[in-house]
Amino acid sequence: MGHALCVCSRGTVIIDNKRYLFVQKLGEGGFSYVDLVEGLHDGHFYALKRILCHEQQDQEEAQREADMHRLFQHPNILRLMAYSLKERGAKHEAWLLLPFFKRGTLWNEIERLKDQGNFLTEDQILPLLLGICRGLEAIHAKGYAHRDLKPTNILLGDEGQPVLMDLGSMNQACIQVEGSRQALALQDWAAQRCTISYRAPELFSVQSHCVIDERTDVWSLGCVLYAMMFGEGPYDMVFQKGDSVALAVQNDLSIPQSPRHSSALRQLLASMMTVDPQQRPHIPVLLSQLEALQPPAPGQHTTQI
């Protein structure tokens, strides 16, 4: 693990013997901050995520997030460039050096279009959805689930390709729940780590004897697809009005009619938003359906889907 050193007078930091210049703050939330930095060795921009670690458990969770990144070398999953632990007296900061995406997140794009009175077209949605699915497929193939998929956790590359980020909530894909104590512990964990308006129904009220699997991500993916289609998540307004999301997700989702969307896309969304997780499709099934729906490349014959 690299060592970090702050040279505040020059606004630079050193990670793994490379110097980075602080440019500006990008954002903050909870106990973490994200800064834009420039690598003085290569002139490239990076996002430096700094996690405040008040306890040993915080350090372990930050290390685990770094370990999750290192599991993957995939175009649709955010790459970790470097990881360092910085000591400041009795406190520590975990630093994750990540690629910088100037286009921001999928949510930024949805909001930008909405401000213009527009939405993503189906021909734009389908390749995005395919890329997100491929990222999830890679995560699930290694026996993990993302558990906090949402538009703000999906970056957009220069060519518009989706890249999954924020792997701090990832855990094992298949969880065998055996008893009320374990069920309550998992439910409490989900309340803290899984965004409420994108959280699968089975995580709101975990049964004493059940199996929670990676299809929680498929539900969240359905919420992301809904947001791409309609400009907001299906339960965003429920949460904003102070109504019960836990109650709302127990009912079948009503999908608005729109001439912008094919029946095939609507059926795909409906399958993802199946309340019973055992009836929800796995990612490989969705991938095969999605690949058949992809818009043709420029110059190819187009058919209505």
Swiss-Prot record:
First-level EC class: transferase
GO molecular function, one term: non-membrane spanning protein tyrosine kinase activity
Processing and modification events after translation: Mainly autophosphorylated on serine/threonine residues. Also autophosphorylated on Tyr-198.
Active site location: 148
Modified residues (Phosphotyrosine): 198
Protein family membership: Belongs to the protein kinase superfamily. Ser/Thr protein kinase family.
Protein name: Serine/threonine-protein kinase 16
Lineage start: Eukaryota, Metazoa, Chordata, Craniata, Vertebrata
